Amino acid sequence: MPELPEVEVVRRGLERWVSGRTVSEVEVLHPRAVRRHLAGGVDFAARLAGARFGAAMRRGKYLWVPIDEASASLLGHLGMSGQLLVRPADAPDEKHLRIRMRFDDALGTELRFVDQRTFGGLSLHANTPDGLPETIAHIARDPLDPLFDDAAFHTALRLRRTTVKRALLDQSLISGVGNIYADEALWRARLHYDRPTATLTRPRSAELLGHARDVMNAALAQGGTSFDSLYVNVNGESGYFDRSLDAYGREGEPCHRCGTPMRRRAWMNRSSYYCPRCQRPPRASS
């Protein structure tokens, strides 16, 4: 699933190619693509027709574009395979095209939502006074947000009876971090994924946050991480940070720091990749 860097790449593309434009027509081609819009596809299309898109926004893995003078927003969640593509209006339809939005200008491009697995979707929601779509108001700020509170994050870590990777994936504590960048940040910080959060000192949690920010910024500079053709930017181009990963997906390969073969362990219906030498498990962990 796309994580913060991949979603931010898409947000920047929407900001460049879609913000400021007015929707003229919407086609909903698959009902699952608007299943989170409870009023249904007909209402979704009718409400968007004539709407002017504001500045594209993001929090964690969610992105949205305000409409109706920011009283509501078009919210997007890419799921496992969702793509928001800006395409020439005369370009052939993609096989898994789910939603098409046309604009009232002469630029000759349209916005398409393409989703092979249909886990993602688009929906319209009222905004909170802070400008967030109401349905994601509970999502915490992400580590690249200038208003992210490092001290509050450390305090929350110390108070929670959990482990460090579980905490990194808790979107009510810190958003935007998924399996890939959690493993990368933990490798850089030399922390085992099962390390209890209560044992982290303030300097260690600050170091971990710093590594999370560094790896996400590095991924952003390379267009994000693409393991297949399902993650692309709005122009259909893949990122290439997968070539720079230090932990994720590197089972059996030498650690880039010490040369020890990297390991993979099943973890919460996912996998965790780590170096058994650099990231020693806590004593209570088997």
Curated annotation (Swiss-Prot):
The keyword Hydrolase applies. Binds 1 zinc ion per subunit. Keywords: DNA damage, DNA repair, DNA-binding, Glycosidase, Hydrolase, Lyase, Metal-binding, Multifunctional enzyme, Zinc, Zinc-finger. Monomer. This is Formamidopyrimidine-DNA glycosylase. Gene3D superfamilies: 1.10.8.50, MutM-like, N-terminal. Involved in base excision repair of DNA damaged by oxidation or by mutagenic agents. Acts as a DNA glycosylase that recognizes and removes damaged bases. Has a preference for oxidized purines, such as 7,8-dihydro-8-oxoguanine (8-oxoG). Has AP (apurinic/apyrimidinic) lyase activity and introduces nicks in the DNA strand. Cleaves the DNA backbone by beta-delta elimination to generate a single-strand break at the site of the removed base with both 3'- and 5'-phosphates. It comes from the Bacteria. PROSITE patterns: FPG_CAT (PS51068), ZF_FPG_1 (PS01242), ZF_FPG_2 (PS51066). DNA binds at residues 96, 117, 160. The keyword DNA-binding applies. The active site is at residues 2-3, 61, 270. Its cofactor is Zn(2+). Its EC number is 3.2.2.23, 4.2.99.18. NCBIfam families: fpg (TIGR00577), PRK01103.1 (NF002211). It catalyses: Hydrolysis of DNA containing ring-opened 7-methylguanine residues, releasing 2,6-diamino-4-hydroxy-5-(N-methyl)formamidopyrimidine; 2'-deoxyribonucleotide-(2'-deoxyribose 5'-phosphate)-2'-deoxyribonucleotide-DNA = a 3'-end 2'-deoxyribonucleotide-(2,3-dehydro-2,3-deoxyribose 5'-phosphate)-DNA + a 5'-end 5'-phospho-2'-deoxyribonucleoside-DNA + H(+). Belongs to the FPG family. GO terms for biological process: base-excision repair. InterPro entries: DNA_glyclase/AP_lyase_DNA-bd (IPR015886), DNA_glyclase_Znf_dom_DNA_BS (IPR015887), Formamido-pyr_DNA_Glyclase (IPR020629), FPG_cat (IPR012319), MutM-like_N-ter (IPR035937), Ribosomal_uS13-like_H2TH (IPR010979), Znf_DNA_glyclase/AP_lyase (IPR000214), Znf_FPG/IleRS (IPR010663). It holds the Pfam family Fapy_DNA_glyco. A zinc finger (FPG-type) spans 246-280. GO terms for molecular function: 8-oxo-7,8-dihydroguanine DNA N-glycosylase activity; class I DNA-(apurinic or apyrimidinic site) endonuclease activity; damaged DNA binding; zinc ion binding.
